[in-house]
């Protein structure tokens, strides 16, 4: 391992430490979707709760990806599946099955 990679926290020990933390820890500070990335607030004055801002972000991504009519979806290491569950739940009537 290079010094740069180690300094960036990419050591095997750091990775194990991150992934060995149980879900209970993440439930303390994530919303019910368990989305582990920034939410989407409208502006600096937006006081929407985290769950609403996360849903806004998920909806934005699904809309821009055209997921409502997609013929397949691939979820690789995207947390706890919140994005995929939202995509399946918001399928357009008559959309092809996944």
Predicted features, each with a name:
Residues 1-29:
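N-terminal auxiliary segments of SAM/dcSAM-dependent transferases
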Residues 57-63, 79-83:
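Short, hydrophobic/aromatic alpha-helical segments in well-folded domains
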Residues 80-93:
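Conserved SAM-binding loop of SAM-dependent methyltransferases across substrates and taxa
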Residues 62-69, 88-91:
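Structural motif corresponding to the C-terminal cap of alpha-helices
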